[in-house]
Amino acid sequence: MIPPADSLLKYDTPVLVSRNTEKRSPTARPLKVTIQQPGPSSTSPQPPKAKLPSTSCVPDPTKQAEEILNAILPPREWVEDTQLWIQQVSSTPSTRMDVVHLQEQLDLKLQQRQARETGICPVRRELYSQCFDELIREVTINCAERGLLLLRVRDEIHMTIAAYQTLYESSVAFGMRKALQAEQGKSDMERKITELETEKRDLERQVNEQKAKCEATEKRESERRQVEEKKHNEEIQFLKRTNQQLKAQLEGIIAPKK
């Protein structure tokens, strides 16, 4: 791990922790650590041992506030050059100037990291979360109850954001499915259009062939009709001439008898 980046949440000075990380229980609390000097032959004095709790039942307000702070805002740990460091949230009360400085730092970091003012912006969300954690820290030091209420507000906000993120991811997945379906439907429609255009050209070719056949048939029938009409006219003329001849012969036979 690398050292954590600068945060709007105020922390105490980092403490070098020496312990066997391989045998550490995964459920061990990072707060209960023993600070030791490297090397057994060091002449520096050993840190004082933790005092046993007094027999009095009255809890220490400062210790209680620190425990609440550590529960709300856990300490952060990192490894640097095979050395484990731990940094707890500061329990120093904040002044009005600290609040003003927090606002200035927030505005400055928003500008430096080029956070977007509108829309979805992970940078803006991260900085606002750090600022809100710092406000929770300041309020918790003065009043633990209000700090716990703000913690509930923060958790509700995180749950709401997580729900919106899940909804957004589901919407994106749904949109992608619909886009793929539309693309598939578009491909099917394009293929169907191509088939219909091919069928249309085939039908047009058949229509043209039938038109050509029809025109040829009409021309042939027209020629045949003309030939038949000419033949019929010749037969009519022949029959008329024959009729005139027979009529003349009949009149020639009948006329002398009178």
UniProtKB/Swiss-Prot annotation:
Looking up Pfam families in the UniProt record yields:
Ax_dynein_light
GO CC, sorted alphabetically, is: 9+2 motile cilium; axoneme; ciliary base; cilium; cytoplasm; dynein axonemal particle; dynein complex; filopodium
Q: What happens when the gene is disrupted?
A: CRISPR-mediated knockout results in loss of sperm motility and fibrous sheath abnormalities with asymmetrical distribution of flagellar proteins in a majority of sperm. Nearly half of the knockout mice develop enlarged heads and hydrocephaly.
| Subcellular localization, as worded in the UniProt entry | Cell projection, Cilium; Cell projection, Cilium, Flagellum; Dynein axonemal particle; Cytoplasm
- Coiled coil recorded as keyword: yes
Q: Name one GO biological process term.
A: sperm flagellum assembly
- Membership in a protein family: Belongs to the inner dynein arm light chain family.
What's this protein's name? Answer: Axonemal dynein light intermediate polypeptide 1
Organism equals: Mus musculus (Mouse)
Upper lineage: Eukaryota, Metazoa, Chordata, Craniata, Vertebrata
